[in-house]
Curated annotation (Swiss-Prot):
Encoding gene per record: murC
NCBIfam families per the UniProt record, alphabetical: murC
Similarity-based family: Belongs to the MurCDEF family.
Catalytic activities: UDP-N-acetyl-alpha-D-muramate + L-alanine + ATP = UDP-N-acetyl-alpha-D-muramoyl-L-alanine + ADP + phosphate + H(+)
GO terms for cellular component: cytoplasm
Enzyme's top EC category: ligase
UniProt source species: Cronobacter sakazakii (strain ATCC BAA-894) (Enterobacter sakazakii)
InterPro entries registered for this protein in UniProt: Mur-like_cat_sf, Mur_ligase_C, Mur_ligase_C_dom_sf, Mur_ligase_cen, Mur_ligase_N, MurCDEF_pg_biosynth, UDP-N-AcMur_Ala_ligase_MurC
Protein's pathway: Cell wall biogenesis; peptidoglycan biosynthesis
Protein name listed in UniProt: UDP-N-acetylmuramate--L-alanine ligase
Amino acid sequence: MNTQQLAKLRSIVPEMRRVRHIHFVGIGGAGMGGIAEVLANEGYQISGSDLAPNAVTQQLTALGATIYFNHRPENVLDASVVVVSSAISADNPEIVAAHEARIPVIRRAEMLAELMRFRHGIAVAGTHGKTTTTAMVSSIYAEAGLDPTFVNGGLVKAAGTHARLGNSRYLIAEADESDASFLHLQPMVAIVTNIEADHMDTYHGDFENLKQTFINFLHNLPFYGRAVMCVDDPVIRELLPRVGRQITTYGFSEDADVRVENYRQTGAQGHFTLVRQDKPELHVTLNAPGRHNALNAAAAVSVATEEGIEDDAILRALESFQGTGRRFDFLGEFPLANVNGKSGTAMLVDDYGHHPTEVDATVRAARAGWPEKNLVMIFQPHRYTRTRDLYDDFANVLSQVDVLLMLDVYPAGEAPIPGADSRSLCRTIRARGKVDPILVSDPAQVAAMLAPVLSGNDLILVQGAGNIGKIARQLAEAKLQPEENAHG
């Protein structure tokens, strides 16, 4: 750490001068890697461990971090503090070794809270839309010359990274409710996009517990802070009287403080008007498809307006918005001549959405922007518990596509649950009579099973949160060609 970096670091958090070496267990995760990247750029010595290399670990290695692709006690012994992902179990050898050596072990959100402590924190929470909204706020602040620090759960395409250290007092961060760790954060502004039943194991299956946790999160705001909340969401509308802070509401609803009107979509762009209290209307062109993204933009504009950012900067940022990785991520348009001998093309889009609400939003955006396309979805359910708990909702939304290929459930460490598997879900969807799903038991066969169902005017949605993103990239690299055709 050089003198200049250390001086800057001490000016932000003087007490953290005692910390030299920060070790991350599960460093390859987007949220963990983002915080590690900011701290590396602040001059800390960073190390971490994960099971396999990925784009996040490559980026950190380039910044000088030491990455171990194993979990061993000796990896942590020189650390001042160990940061642990919620995906890591308490019996991990590095965690055990840290406890034995009396090295503090903290969760990711606790370290994020330290980054936020002496900055103007803007935290983005909610069941859906966090990553994109965080990126939109960051883009607007950057366009306005405010040079924010941001820590996002997905790749911010314009920056080519999940996180970036800025030189201003602003820190914009995604706030994760999945393990309730967002309660560590004490932001100045908090966005809540929506609240639905997800990650219910954290909340002991009690939706009231989840709702109260969001209230507690908002009450971490100082009394002069501000909550920015989507009034279209019925749960948020119900909770508004319980929020003892200043509130700005947004949405399509007539009574929203920042109201979306006249929405229309052409291809990948949304066009709409934002009506604000005591401010001129904004006529927005948003470079992201779907009504859900208009809501995300309304949240970002609400925050930017409150900060006093000029309208021109807001409009420029939204029109040039490059999106985030795996959120309606356009991977290319490929001719089918070498795929199945047909004329025409197929567009390939990769999307992380894995909850029925998210999948529905993606399908609606695809239908609105490309109504003439044959909509083909390759879906990988994520977790047996989610598939069980939202089974009917999944069956309904997946019945909306023209062609459905379904991979086996990505377990994310869970044991199989009878009746909550992909074969059962396919059977249920088939019985509804709208679409005849194709079960793909071997991921290596996706391209071969996809080729015959493509018509020559297709939009392929690769959908899910497991390892299906890797399959999307492989399809793009092979230009959709099955392996036996790929070299022909």
